[in-house]
Structures are given as structure tokens and as C-alpha cells.
Amino acid sequence: MLGKSTHKIAVIAGDGIGKEVMPHGVRSVLAAAKKFGIEIEVTEYNWSCDQYDQIGSWMPSDWKQQLDQFDCIFFGAVGWPDRVLDHISLWDSLIKFRREFDQYVNLRPVRLMPGVKSPLAGKKPGDIDYYVVRENTEGEYSSLGGRLFEGTDREMAQQISTFTRKGVDRIMNFAFELAMTRNKNLVSATKSNGISITMPYWDERFAAIGARFPDVSRSQYHIDGLTIQVVLDPGRFDVIVASNLFGDILSDLGPATTGTIGIAPSANLNPERAFPSLFEPVHGSAPDIYGKGIANPIGQIWSGAMML
């Protein structure tokens, strides 16, 4: 955020424990901004499943016009399945943000923090510290396909994965550039021995973009073997780049090895800043603990630190 006079942040606490942890996140961001001389202007939006019955959607129809003026979106959580089915609330909020604001990078740090016990024996802070760079707008979650002959013995469902050159190249480029700022080690998650069209293409673009970064050591693992190594030897990783589905898996598995996904942060980035980026904790809305005063705000605070 440095280099601009006033930074405008849209705050959306959302559902469940998002409403409980967001005040801690905002206070922390404002305190850090004051300490480092960063001018911040915060605007809060009370969009959630609460209003679904009234307006028939998670947020108003002009949401994009309202949010387009901001530099960043600071987000809490989405989902209250007793009111709105999860896939409806998610696709009516976060998925819209990611796609219509072209937030094509999902960035998740995986770090073992002091005071948190890893389920992996003998691990201490510093032993686990890497990033998962997930493609965030296409791939296996492209939503192309459909269903036919529902309710009959001919019923079928088909969903198509879409990998564009632009989409693959830009996520690879981001990952290589991130690796250059760290230990210059990048791993690609693939499955080209089983997924015979899209994954070989992914591998080809990994090699092509990698040729521009000769100082970065690069390797690739099939996703099944990679999940094993993330558990057995997480210290070997620095930056992992993955497709939408594989990144989704790895970015939950990784924080689990650090003791809990409950404090993990994430960033949904439009690196060119043509649209606002979104910062949110990994945890969900957790309706089962909402109102009990036990929600941990560290994920929200850490997401705020990534935003700054």
C-alpha cells in the first residue's frame, strides 16, 4: 500500500464469526497504519446471508460499482447454511469478487507460528515456511458444463477444465517472481501422468516461463506425491504454484501441518491493481461457534498485515 496518499478499504465482515473477528482485524490495521504513517479510509458494508430473504442475493446488484472505487477489500467470512445454501452464498460473493475483479492470484502463506504446536513431530517455528500460489479464476473451477437427463438412468454430469495461455502464464510468472524474492526455489503441482491434456500444457508453460528465470531452481511433483511430501518434509518447500483445484487442496493441507487452519490468512490479488484485491482469513463462518466468544482473530489480523 506504500506510495499512495490515502488508501481506501472496503470492510465486509460477512457471516458468522466474520462479524466477531473483523473488529480485531480493523483495529490492528488502523494501529499499524498510524504507526507507519499510512493514511487509511475505511468503509463498512453489512452484506451477508442476513439480507438474502429481503433482496434475494448476498449483496446488492450494484456491488461492483460500489466496490470498484476501493484499493482493497477486507473480508471476514461467508456462509450460513441454515438460511442460504453454501454454494449459493459463496458464488454470490467471493467467486464474483475473484472473477469480476480478476483476482487471479490466491496467495497463502504456510508458516508454523510461535506458540502453535504442529501435528508433525519435532517441528518448531522456522521449520515450515512457504507460500502456495494458486490460480484463482479458471482451471478446474471454470463452471463450464452441465447436466442432462436428470432423474433417469441416462443421467449425466459434465464439467470442463479450462486452462488459457494468458491465465497459466500470468500465475506462473507471479510465482517465479515471488520465488526470486525468497530462496529461489519453485515447485509446480501437476498430474500430467493421469490428466493427459491440460496438465501437460501446464507443465509446458511452467518450463517456458521458467526459462526466463534461470536463477530459480524449479521442479514439479504429481499432486498425490506432493501432498505426501508436504506432510513428510515441509521444510523443503519455498514456493509452490498450482492450478485452482490443486492449489485449493494444498493451501488447506499446508496450514493444517502448522497446527490449525484457523489462524491462516489469504490474499486474492489483482497484481496489476486494475481492480481491488481481497484479503480474508482461511477459516469459514463457523456458525457452530458463532456467539460463543471463542473465535481466534489471528487469521483476520494476519490477512490485514498482508493487505498492508
Which residues does each PLM region occupy?
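Extreme N-terminal starter segment of soluble prokaryotic enzymes
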Residues: K4-I9
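N-terminal beta-loop-helix "entrance" segment that forms/cooperates
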Residues: G37-S61, V230
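Short acidic loop-to-helix transition motifs that present clustered carboxylates
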Residues: G115, Y221-I228
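Glycine-rich phosphate/diphosphate-binding loop of Rossmann-like nucleotide-binding domains
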Residues: A10-R27, A31-A33, T152-D224, R236
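N-terminal glycine-rich phosphate/adenylate-binding segment common to multiple enzyme folds
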Residues: D53-Q158, L245-G247
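Glycine-rich phosphate/nucleotide-binding loop
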Residues: Q229-L308
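Short, acidic/small-residue loops that bind anionic groups at enzyme active sites
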Residues: I95-L112, R212-Y221, A264-E280
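Buried hydrophobic positions in well-ordered alpha/beta secondary-structure cores of metabolic enzymes
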Residues: D15-G18, D71, V133, A175, ...
